[in-house]
Amino acid sequence: MLSEEQKRRIESMYNEYYGLALKPETKDMKSFYIGKYLAIEDVLRICGYFVHDGEIRELD
């Protein structure tokens, strides 16, 4: 179970990488940022969570 502080920190990282992927400096950087936020999604899914509209929610 994630604490509220952990959720806020992860959401912040996720949203930062997602935003950077939308306006990358180069194509390689876009791939880098996409990889980062997809990795966060994968780890959250393993822990029983998912991201919806930039917010972490528990899987049912």
PLM regions: where:
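Short, charge/polar-rich alpha-helical segments
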Residues: 1-11, 15
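Short, charge-rich amphipathic interface segments used for partner binding and complex assembly
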Residues: 16-23, 27-60
